[in-house]
Structures are given as C-alpha cells and as structure tokens.
Amino acid sequence: MGKEQFRARTGCLTCRDRHIKCDEALPRCKNCCKSNRQCERGIRLNFIETQTSNAQPQAELPPGTKLKFHDESQAIASGYAVGAQEVKLVQISNTEPKPQTELPQAGASKDGSIPQAKTVSSTEQTTLVSAQRSPLPALRLITDHDESLLMEIFLGKVAPWMDCLVANKPFTNTAPFCALRHPALYNAIMACGEKYLMPTEESLYYGKACQGLQLETAKPNTDHGLCVATSTLLNAYETMGDGVNECRSDRTRALMGKANLDGGSSDSLVRDSKLSCDTDRMKAALNVDHGAEVAQGTYNDSPQRLSQDCEQYKGWCDEWASNVPRSMMPLCYIPPPDQDASSATATHFPQVMFVGSSSTVARLLYHVSCLLLARIQAAERSAESQEAQSRQTRHAMDICGIASQGEDKYETLSLDEQTHELLLHSSSPFRGTGTLITIFPETETLATWLSAVFPLLFGILTNLKSRKKHFKFWIELLKTHLGGRASFNPKSV
C-alpha cells in the first residue's frame, strides 16, 4: 500500500489560492520562496448559505411593525482562535441620536432687552440659551460668530442680488427668519455666504442643504415655499462658483421635480408682513420726548407723579418689546467676550444684527428710552439704584453693540472731535470699564450724547422713504427734544 496522503490544515493562503500543496514551513514556505510571492497566513472564513431550495417566501409585515436585528458575526468569529483574541464585543445602544433640527435659542428678558445668550458652535446648535425669569416665548438666534458673519454676507451681498426684481425682497426680509426654523434653508443660506467668501472652495453647508431638501421633499405634507426657496438658493450657490456643475444642477432640478414644484410656486415667497400689534401703541411705547425732559430736569410735577409716569413709560416699553413682530427682533446676538480677553481686536460690546434699518432704529430708540428711565429711577429711588444701574449698563451695552454693526454709521456724523471720539468708543474712561455709566456723570453730558446719537439714527432713516409714516411720530418728538442743537433735516427722511 502506498503512503497515505494528508491535507495541510495550517498551510499558507497563497498556496491554497494556487491550488498546490504547502509544506507549512515557517515563517515562509518553500513554494512562496521559489516564486518570490508573499506568504499570507491566517484564517479565511467562508460563509455558505444553506437550505436555499427550501427557503420560504418573505412574509409581508404591516406598516409600523418594530424590527429588532441581532448581529451574530462577532459570536461566529469568536469561535476561532484568532477571532477570540482580536474581536472585542461592542455594546450597541438602542437609542438613536436626535438630529440637529433647531438652531440655538434664547429667551427675551423680563424688561425686553436683548438676552445675554451664550456663544455656541455649529455642532452645538441644539443648546438652549434662556434668560432668567423670561415670560416670553423662546427666540431662535444665531449665536456663532462664523455663522453670523456668513449671514451678514448673505444679507449684504447675495440677497440684494437675488431680490433685485422683487419689490418685497423675500430673500432679505423673509428667508433669514424662516431659516431659523428650517435647517435646510439655513444651510443653503450659509452655503451662499461661504461661496461668496471662497468661490473656489466646496461648502459643507451645501451638502447638508441638499440632504435636508431631499428629506423635505419626501414628506407627505411638503412645504412647497420652503422647497422653492432652498432650491433657488442652491442654484444661486452653483452659479456663484467658477463653473456651473451640471451634475449638481441636475440634482437640484430633480429634487424640485420630485416635489412637483414649478416657477409659479415662488409666489409663496412674497408675503406682505403685517405688524402683530397696534401701531399707535408701538409708537407710544417709546416716548423719548418725556424721558429726555425728565433727564434734563425740566419735569415740573411732584416726585410721586414722576415715579408713576416712569412706571407707565417703562410698562409701555416692556409692552412694545413683548408685542413687536419677529422681523423687528434680532437675528444674531453674540455676547461680548470676557473682560480678560487678550485679543487686540476684542470688543467690549455684543454683536447684534437686525434685518432692515427700521428694526435697527426702533431697537435703538427702545434702548435709549429704557436707559433714560433707568437713570431716572436710580436717581429717585436709592433702594432700587443697584437694579436700575444694572439695567443702565445692559441697555448701554446693547446700544453700542447695535450701533457698531452699521456700515453707514459714520456718514451722517457732523460732530466735534470729542463727540466723534465718544461715538467711536475710544474715550479713555470708557475703555477701562466697558460701560456707558462713566460717560454719563452729569445730565449735561447725557444730553450732549443724545444730541450726537439721534442724528446718527436719522441718517439711517434716510433710506426708509417708503416707511415714512411709521416714523413720523418719532420725527416730531425728536425734533421737539433736540431743537436747534443737532444738524439734521427731518424733511429729508
């Protein structure tokens, strides 16, 4: 009888692939040495499907059935020597992470001032930033510096180009606030702002916007206006690049076609915004004239009557802040940095962004009124002076934060060098404290500062001819208050 043949069980994988017998030499077999091949070692797993002929047809499950999957691959691999040493069991959590569907939120403060929100990054967009004792609904705000810059670029550079043929300017007045509730539209706006800054770079926001638009079109109750706005912005993003990418353009058109959208649906973007409260009450809420008279010491009533009037004026201001429409509330709010910030370009003021000059002017008038009332209460009521002092600081910081964001803030100034330096936030006592309290030591100084600020506000109003009637009330009040001290012409508004 011949010699019994045996099959190698620990041979190399290279000889097995070549279908030749391996001598099982270590660390390299002779066959691999002769042919100058790599001698591969290890265990190869072959999964063989069994009982394929007797497989039963898949049962149809009713909609909504919960399925649970068991991963048995690690249990199989653990039966081998190598698998038992290398494979580690991983516990998989059954809880799914919540998607990022909302932007940072901040609540309005009790006195209506802009909340001191915390700065969050784009990866922390679900963080809720609420002010204490807030009786008002939470507001969605952009609190990330980079995203605030992209939004500012979109409003200043991209949106005017897209609204050049539409009188109501939907991409300037409507889209930014809708984007705070819809991540797809928000990412599309961020992508356009980033493309304007870096035309040759691909934006991560573009991919997120396309993905969000695809999910939106798959919903049974698709918001056609949202899809049209997002698709239009994505097309604008593609147009701003070096060359129009046909593949991406086809994908955008396919998404629009899937949602049964056409050009006529864009009418849903044009809406006439209406104020959500009585216009006369909103105007009366910021009665700057009486506040200025009291601050200058020309109020002749008794201290008790003065206190009652201050409470009434403060109630008007709070009511205005509570009922003002969302379009007149801040779109972005970035708190000031820490006092020990080492950056040379660090500012002591918050960065506040509004959409439209009317919102900016209205909020500035509101903060000036609250600042005057807080100063009066601090002087009349010693027991509440600390709380009033805190309100003065908060409103003063917001005034400087809003005024420092305007592009045309210096075009209408015709002031002496000292007042101009004051408005540039560069006076020496102001740098040391970061507040406006130290520059108001006397009533005369306060009146001088107001005389410098109000012409600045009227300069912003020069572009609001279509909304002249909304500010006629303020023009008359400020004209009476300022008299001949300020160089402005209300008829030019």
Curated annotation (Swiss-Prot):
InterPro entries (alphabetical): Zn2-C6_fun-type_DNA-bd_sf (IPR036864), Zn2Cys6_DnaBD (IPR001138)
Amino acid composition bias (Polar residues), ranges on this chain: 116-129
GO CC field: membrane; nucleus
CDD domains: GAL4 (cd00067)
GO annotation terms (biological process): positive regulation of transcription by RNA polymerase II
Location of region: Disordered: 94-129
Transmembrane segments: 445-464
DNA-binding region, residues: 12-39
UniProt keyword list: DNA-binding, Membrane, Metal-binding, Nucleus, Transcription, Transcription regulation, Transmembrane, Transmembrane helix, Zinc
Subcellular locations according to the entry: Membrane; Nucleus
Pfam families reported for this sequence: Zn_clus (PF00172)
Predominant place of localization: membrane
GO molecular function: DNA-binding transcription factor activity, RNA polymerase II-specific; transcription cis-regulatory region binding; zinc ion binding
Membrane topology label: Single-pass membrane protein
SMART domains: GAL4
Function recorded in the entry: Transcription factor; part of the gene cluster that mediates the biosynthesis of the meroterpenoids arthripenoids.
Name of the protein described by the UniProt record: Transcription factor atnE
Organism: Arthrinium sp
Gene: atnE
